[in-house]
């Protein structure tokens, strides 16, 4: 008669000491993992690992997106990840004349498809350098009005072989008190402080907006959002490759203000007075040209919307009262002459109808016209580019 298999003895109930040891080991492992993460600070190294420019094409402009699900893009503050995702990271071709285009949201191309931006329009012109190389323009604009942001991006980008730098600027970009307003600068505080020290900039390295991280701020728990952003950027690479979309553009774009208030203030300056170096960051502009070294830099006073509506005798647009902008133009021209900069003033080069929602954002036709005008003034005296 077959015998029934002996039943396994019942497991003893989980007693409190055993449970305590399990929890203690888990806490110890969790603590060690966070301590190792804080000590290694791996986010920048992880940012350099990218699907872009390898398995999938690089982006035509730096990552920036307010609604990732619609933009197939997102905003993050990891500079290595931003540049690893950009097409600038691909190897430079032997016949390539590499042009870096830096600047604000107008350069980045707000409400423009990437091929309709200034960089895209310049590339569409099929330009050649004097030595016959193909002119390839890389869009390194970023939607922040800050010359310090431009310097930060330029300092990062110049590890790649550049032949020319185009640098559109506007008065708001020089406002000293607003240089650190964006998280890109705040979260890259060590890099910003290094630039301040390296170029003796009249900016406060201890500004409260610049983040100071303790060891606890560098743990995996504290930086989990930044780590998730790296993963999200890689996840969006397939959508970018499949669609070429990196910004959701509404069907109806709101137009800039034409009828203006009778208000002579500029930012926190209540009314007309001389603008000084305490107001304007010409030192940061000098630092950018110095950082370029032997790479030629063309400083461009970018076009602005000029209103003919109510109170247009007081203000050019919603950004700028006439007194402040006129002083800025005069001071920029004087600084360029004194420093020997290559300088182009295109402030009134674009008709008012070719601006969209702000005084510095262009339509596709406006960006095309700007590209053509820029080529006209650069050829042949400055860089000798030709079709």
Regions found by a protein language model. Give the residues of each.
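Residue-level recognition of beta-strand->loop/alpha-helix junctions
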Residues: 139-141, 301-303, 345-348
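Hydrophobic membrane-insertion alpha-helices, especially the h-region
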Residues: 21-39
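Conserved SGNH/GDSL esterase-like catalytic core that processes O-acyl groups on lipids
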Residues: 108-193
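Loop/turn elements at helix/coil->beta-strand transitions in domains of secreted/extracellular proteins
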Residues: 97, 133-135, 160-165, 293-297, ...
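Catalytic His-Asp segment of secreted/periplasmic serine-dependent ester chemistry enzymes
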Residues: 306-387
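Serine-dependent acyl-ester chemistry module
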Residues: 175-330, 351-352
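Membrane/wall-proximal cationic-aromatic binding patches
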Residues: 42-132, 353-354
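N-terminal Lys/Arg-rich, disordered targeting/topogenic segments
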Residues: 1-18
């Amino acid at each position: 008669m077959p015998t029934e298999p002996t039943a396994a003895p019942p497991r003893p109930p989980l007693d409190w000491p055993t449970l305590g040891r399990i929890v203690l080991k888990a806490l110890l492992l969790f603590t060690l993992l966070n301590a190792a993460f804080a000590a290694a600070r791996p986010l920048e190294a992880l940012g350099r690992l990218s699907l872009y420019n390898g398995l999938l094409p690089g982006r035509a402009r730096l990552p920036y997106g307010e609604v990732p699900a619609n933009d197939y893009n997102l905003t993050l503050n990891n500079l290595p990840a931003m540049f690893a995702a950009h097409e600038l990271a691909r190897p430079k071709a032997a016949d390539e004349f590499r042009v870096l285009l830096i600047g604000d949201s107008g350069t980045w191309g707000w409400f423009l498809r990437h091929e309709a931006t200034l960089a895209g329009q310049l590339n569409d012109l099929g330009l050649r350098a004097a030595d016959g190389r193909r002119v390839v323009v890389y869009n390194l604009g970023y939607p922040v009005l800050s010359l310090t942001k431009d310097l930060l991006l330029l300092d990062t980008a110049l590890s790649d072989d550049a032949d020319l730098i185009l640098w559109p600027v506007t008065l708001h970009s020089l406002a000293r008190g607003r240089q650190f307003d964006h998280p890109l600068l705040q979260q890259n505080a060590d890099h910003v402080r290094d630039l301040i020290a390296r170029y003796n900039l009249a900016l406060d390295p201890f500004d409260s907006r610049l983040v100071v991280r303790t060891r606890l701020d560098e743990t995996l728990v504290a930086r989990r959002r930044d780590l998730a952003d790296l993963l999200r950027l890689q996840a969006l690479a397939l959508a970018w490759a499949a669609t070429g979309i990196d910004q959701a553009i509404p069907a109806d774009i709101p137009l800039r203000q034409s009828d203006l208030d009778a208000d002579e203030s500029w930012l926190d300056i209540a009314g007309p007075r001389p603008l000084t170096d305490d107001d304007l960051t010409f030192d940061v502009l000098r630092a950018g040209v110095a950082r370029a070294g032997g790479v030629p830099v063309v400083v461009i006073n970018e076009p602005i919307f000029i209103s003919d509506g109510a109170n247009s005798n007081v203000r050019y647009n919603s950004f700028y009262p006439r007194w402040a902008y006129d002083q800025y133009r005069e001071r920029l021209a004087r600084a360029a002459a004194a420093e020997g900069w290559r300088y182009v003033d295109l402030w009134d080069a674009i008709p008012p109808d070719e601006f969209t929602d702000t005084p510095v954002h262009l339509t596709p036709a406006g960006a095309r016209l700007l590209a053509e005008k820029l080529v006209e003034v650069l050829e042949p005296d400055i860089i000798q580019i030709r079709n």
